[in-house]
Amino acid sequence: MNLVVFDIGGTSVKYGRYQDSAIDKKGSFPTPKTWEEMKENLHRVFTELSDADTKGVAISSPGAVDTEEGVIKGFSAIPYIHNFKIIDELEAMFGLPVTIENDANCAGLAESQFGIGKDSKKSIYFILGTGIGGAVCLDGKLYKGSSLYGGEFGFMIIKDGITLSNLASPVAVAKNTLKSMA
């Protein structure tokens, strides 16, 4: 199966072509400031990487992905990707099926099935990037909870309304360090 794959992050979008169980033609571009710019970049990369054998597009993204509604809910460092029928819009643009899942869930699921957690019935995965995310896997399947926020450790309130991401993500630590040195 051939897919064009994207990993949408707060600072960059990584991409590649999944073909024959491997990813090739890898690259990245800075995360755009607007949804229109994002679509232009995604379409450009898709055009470069896809061929007649491409069956779909797979995307990992921040936020609480509601696959039934086709919407990325919640909040992230990329506010313009939330709270609209993003999957429908992307499928219309690419002309192929699109699957989106939370970035930490993608990483956690891969670890639970192929990595360090493959011999465990329960695993927890933390991801540190622009924010802090995570995933909970039970019996090799994602646990999202009733509100899709299972594993979203970055939203935990630590003190006085400050979240774990606001306090301890790599970006927050760098900002706080620079602020304290000024």
Q: Which residue ranges define each predicted feature?
A:
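A generic "binding-loop/recognition-motif" signal
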Residues: 11, 104-105, 149
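Short, small-residue-rich loop/turn micro-motifs
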Residues: 61-63, 146
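Glycine-rich phosphate-binding loop and adjoining helix at the ATP-binding site
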Residues: 32-43, 56-57, 64-122
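Short secondary-structure boundary segments
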Residues: 1-13, 84, 88, 121
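Glycine/GP-enriched mid-protein hinge/lid loop-to-helix segment characteristic of carbohydrate kinases
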Residues: 16-19, 24, 28, 35-38, ...
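Conserved phosphate-binding loops in N-terminal lobes of ATP-dependent enzymes
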Residues: 3-61, 68
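A generic structural signal for well-ordered alpha-helical segments enriched in polar/charged residues
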Residues: 44-48, 92, 179
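Short glycine/serine/threonine-rich phosphate/pyrophosphate-binding segments
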Residues: 13, 106-108, 133-135
